[in-house]
Amino acid sequence: MISWNYASASLLCYFWFKPDLSHVSISNTPWWLIIALGVLLPSVFLFLAKSLQYAGIVKTEIAQRLSVILSLLAAYFIFQEQFNQLKIVGVVLGLAAVMCILFTNASGGGEGQKQAVWYLALVWFGYALIDVLLKYTTGLGVQFSVALSLMFICAFLLSVGYVAVTTKNIGLTKNVVAGLCLGVLNFANIALYVKAHLLLKDSPAVVFAGMNIMVVLLGVFSGLLFFKEKLKLATAIGLVLGITSVACLAYAMSV
């Protein structure tokens, strides 16, 4: 299912953004980045699925959205972005939120809880790494639509190849259909996010904060209402710290 998700995402990316693939070349295209992201994209999807299985939707959504903390640290240490006091407070609160979420699972000591901690950490780190590599790609002069198309195509080919080698088939019909539908949602998420940045190009903090805060809240409420998950004290504290962290960072970027 994950493999075929990137097939439909590739097609939609081509027809939506209409990338000019004539400029793609062996020497001028950052293939190492394309391949790295082609491996990371489906891998993080697998980590996400395992995290949902062992840790639940509430903690997984929070960990995923708080990956922005690592991205901001990379912005400071790698991309030399200047940090004010509010940004530093936001980073510290975000790290504290992640620790609360991870130690909610670590406290029990069971095998499933240990796996939950590992997969939450992989989701947190994986999404941040993808974000950093995407930012690095856009700074190399490659059209974002071209890079995105190549990433989706690479992710599809590598994941299909992996499935074909390990399972000797490329999926049941229902999994292929489900994957194609998932690709529509996956692409829509990226396309609408880019569109929002284009429409609000002078207010990126509004788009950034709106996406992260609302997704975390919707993820938490979905877990509580539909999946009947219990909200432990440490998770609740992590949620509050996470929302406060993103709010601080958004305000810091807008002043």
Where do the model's predicted regions map?
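Polytopic alpha-helical membrane proteins, predominantly small-molecule transporters/carriers
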Residues: M1-V255
